[in-house]
Every structure is written in structure tokens, then in C-alpha cells.
């Protein structure tokens, strides 16, 4: 039986001009992850990431720990199927109508720029609409389209894998959520309730044999918990 380890990227730069950059905390999370995996003796046959910088930087920061110990590291393969959905595009497309139909949304929005919990509230309302699929304007990647994209990436991995391989996939919370939805047949709304709980640099293990895939573990972040440093356990 083979294993795919879905690894969420480290904390990105919320509120900065460029979100797609690991914060100092995100870099530390990735380094801690790499040391933990190396200590476990977990050696990967393949390593895949999307083309987002936060995903690839998480991979490089983690595997720097392997290099320091002389452990083998496979070359990074890039597959854009594992990119996150475009949250900014979804917000731009769906926010105007939300503000006209949800009276509380405008007040939440006023506080969202500097307050992560308020941003989370408005974003959750927008995601509800995106999942419903009834508000999507032309050109916006739909939830169903996103799921199909992620599924195609998983299929490419499985087609090239044998049943003994260990494969690391450095990706994002939404991508992991889509795979949970596909593999467990969990309703999309329920899967997104779990999405909000996915910790940065958490491990989510899939077991596979041929085309059959099962969820083996979800949101494991023991590497962070062992440090007893709550500031390293982040969700955004």
C-alpha cells in the first residue's frame, strides 16, 4: 500500500501586499515539520507541489532539514492542479451581491481588513455561495470545477505511482478539503467546516492501492504540538 502525504503550506502573509509569501512563523513551521519527518525516518519517493510560492517554499524549507542530515530528497515536481482556489477572485465576484442581500455583511467587512476573525466570518459567507454554485459569474472557477481540477492532479499521481511509494504533496487547505470531499464523499459544506480547522504544515495521509484511495489521517500537527509553542499553531 502506498501513501500520499498532503501537507498544507506554512503560514502565509495575511494582510501584506503579497499573501503568497511565508511569514517568519510559516518558515519556522516548515523547518519544524522537516526535522520531525526526518526524525521519523520518512523518506519520500516523490515530491509534488502546486506553483504557488508558499507551497514550494514550505517544501524547500522542510527538505533543507533533510539535506542537513544527508537524507535523500526527490526533485520537486510542479502540478498546478494542487494550487489553492483563487480566494481573491471569488471575493471580488461574489461580495457585491452578498452586501446587498446580507445586512450584517457590510459591518463585518469594515472590520475584516485588520481582524482575522471578522475576515473569516465574511469569507465563510462568501464560500457558502460559492459552494452553492448559483452565484458564479462567467470566468470564475466554480467549486465543481475546482474539485475536478484537484481530482485530475490526484489521478496523475496515482497513474504514475506504484503501491509501495511514499509521496509528499505540498498544497493548500482548500485543495485538501476538495480531496476530503472526493475521497470520503462528505458533503461540500461539511468538508469546509473541517477546512477551517486545517493547521498550517499539518499532515493529511492518504493510503492508496491502484486507483483505490482512503483517508488514513487528518490534520496531524504533532510536530508543532511537541514544541509546546502555541504561536506556531496557526490556521491562516
Regions found by a protein language model. Give the residues of each.
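Phosphate-coordination/substrate-recognition cap region in phosphate-metabolizing enzymes
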Residues: 35-121
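Active-site metal-binding loops of divalent metal-dependent hydrolases
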Residues: 10, 173-174, 219-222
Amino acid at each position: 500500500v502506498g501513501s500520499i502525504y498532503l501537507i498544507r503550506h506554512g503560514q502565509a502573509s495575511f494582510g501584506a501586499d503579497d499573501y503568497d509569501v511565508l511569514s517568519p512563523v510559516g518558515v519556522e513551521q516548515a523547518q519544524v515539520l522537516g526535522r520531525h519527518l526526518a526524525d521519523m525516518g520518512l523518506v519520500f519517493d516523490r515530491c509534488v507541489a502546486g506553483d504557488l510560492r508558499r507551497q514550494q517554499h514550505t517544501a524547500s524549507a522542510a527538505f533543507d532539514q533533510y539535506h542537513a542530515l544527508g537524507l535523500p530528497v526527490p526533485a520537486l515536481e510542479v502540478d498546478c492542479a494542487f494550487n489553492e482556489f483563487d480566494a481573491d477572485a471569488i471575493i471580488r465576484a461574489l461580495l457585491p451581491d452578498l452586501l446587498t442581500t446580507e445586512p450584517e455583511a457590510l459591518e463585518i467587512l469594515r472590520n475584516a481588513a485588520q481582524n482575522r476573525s471578522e475576515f473569516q466570518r465574511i469569507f465563510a459567507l462568501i464560500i457558502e455561495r460559492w459552494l452553492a454554485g448559483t452565484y458564479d459569474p462567467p470566468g470564475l472557477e466554480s467549486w465543481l470545477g475546482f474539485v475536478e481540477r484537484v481530482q485530475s492532479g490526484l489521478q496523475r499521481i496515482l497513474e504514475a505511482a506504484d503501491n509501495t511509494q511514499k509521496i509528499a504533496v505540498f498544497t493548500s487547505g482548500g485543495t485538501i478539503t476538495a480531496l476530503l470531499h472526493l475521497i470520503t464523499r462528505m458533503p461540500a459544506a461539511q468538508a469546509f467546516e473541517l477546512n477551517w480547522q486545517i493547521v498550517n504544515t499539518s499532515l493529511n495521509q492518504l493510503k492508496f492501492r491502484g486507483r483505490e484511495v482512503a483517508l488514513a489521517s487528518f490534520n496531524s500537527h504533532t510536530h508543532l504540538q511537541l514544541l509546546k509553542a502555541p504561536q506556531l499553531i496557526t490556521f491562516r
